[in-house]
């Protein structure tokens, strides 16, 4: 799809539900691209349980047989009534001991008995312990236990939320105890990570500002990691949070992306990717926060866990207007994108890089020229020819968009780089949208060939000949019988415009040609079955 504002673009958008900003001619990311988020690291980002086991104990637990584990757990569960009784005690020392036992039970590595603990009815007691400002150690143990309960299913989290924990945890972000503050940060991260509804409840309870106060130069690394992760959960999810509520996070994120810690960098970049995913005013706010120079540096980060969200954020920004896209070019992101295309990166990264480039080539002629000058076209064509289908699709958009907005010379350059053959090859792919994208790219190329012919460069459209030589003509013919009306109509139009005129004398008038064309037939009387070009 050429993505220029036009009536056809409107038809395509309604037919295929493509997320296209018709005014700016750029593609928003579609839901089927979220597979880049499906790494285990990202799966675990929503909620985290604090296990608290020292390394040696954790190793021993991992090595122990399953039966031994379940037997030991059963023994502990048999002790629950006594633990419940102890939690209800009026003796602070007994309360602490019992709460610590519950915390340890909820911290076991495999299948912690969250439901069983909830069913004992101790959650309201833990909530009460959160408010014991005179006893920070008890607050800490209760907060840890509730954090792990909230790390379970949505129903588990709901129990914590409906017990009134959220405003208390927000208040604990101002506790004089660093351990209590950090545990409150973690608990709120688990609640916010459960669902957009829970996230909005935390934000409405005033969770953002006291969270941002934890992100200071005196914070220890574990606090920075937890607070950045929680902040990313505050920004995450669809429907998105109210942007004005989370916009203050940008200045903190601008500092956090200069961290040398990979975990902090990863979560800070994911937060930026969520905040930049949307309308141009959101994109502008991200640009104005000053994150861009560092974001481009992070496109070269050796860790994929940092690189992916940094790339995602850059990709979001080029869905904006031409000026916002220019910001990406001006900060020298194109050489980094070239590196992502040519180095040995995984499929999801190459796909995302091609998607980003496709939105740059949907820009103005100067932006298309910047992509050409960065020597990106040749590797893009190589991917279009040889990569996995998911990457080919994005590369096809990138090339087709360049043919749509490019000058004649730019389009001639694309042809010289070998784009015709791979575009022709994709005409047989099962995705009708990509067939349309390739047809439009080829049609734009044919228009330039026609203009060259009319300028006296020869008697034939040399690009029509190149498409024929690349077996594209036969493929375009076959598209006359495609189920998709738009593809069928475009194929017929292209055949009529660029191959039929030579055969005009041999063509019958009337209805005989209505079933399609078969070019190259030397008989003067062509059968009603259609014409065969070639």
From Swiss-Prot:
Description of what induces expression: Slightly increased by dark treatment.
InterPro entries reported for this sequence: ARM-like, ARM-type_fold, Arm_3, Armadillo, Importin-a_IBB, Importin-a_IBB_sf, Importin_alpha
Annotated spans, Disordered: 505-534
Record-linked SMART domains: ARM (SM00185)
Annotated keywords: Cytoplasm, Protein transport, Repeat, Transport
Main location: cytoplasm
Any one GO cellular component localisation term in the record: perinuclear region of cytoplasm
Record GO terms (molecular function): nuclear import signal receptor activity; nuclear localization sequence binding
Keyword Electron transport (UniProt): no
Gene Ontology biological process terms, A to Z: NLS-bearing protein import into nucleus
Tissues and organs where the protein is expressed, per its UniProt entry: Highly expressed in root and weakly in callus, etiolated leaf and green leaf.
IBB domain segment(s): 1-58
Swiss-Prot/TrEMBL ARM repeat ranges: 111-151, 154-193, 196-236, 238-277, 280-319, 322-362, 365-404, 408-447
Low complexity bias locations: 514-523
PROSITE patterns xrefs: ARM_REPEAT, IBB
Cellular location(s): Cytoplasm, Perinuclear region
Entry keyword annotation includes Cell inner membrane: no
Function of the protein: Functions in nuclear protein import. Binds specifically and directly to substrates containing either a simple or bipartite NLS motif. Promotes docking of import substrates to the nuclear envelope. In conjunction with importin beta-1, mediates the nuclear envelope docking, and the subsequent translocation into the nucleus of the constitutive morphogenetic 1 (COP1) protein containing bipartite NLS motif.
The family this protein is said to belong to: Belongs to the importin alpha family.
Assembly and interaction partners: Forms a complex with importin subunit beta-1. The whole complex, most stable and composed of importin alpha and importin beta, is referred to as PTAC or pore targeting complex.
Name of this protein: Importin subunit alpha-1b
Species the sequence originates in: Oryza sativa subsp. japonica
Taxonomic classification: Eukaryota, Viridiplantae, Streptophyta, Embryophyta, Tracheophyta
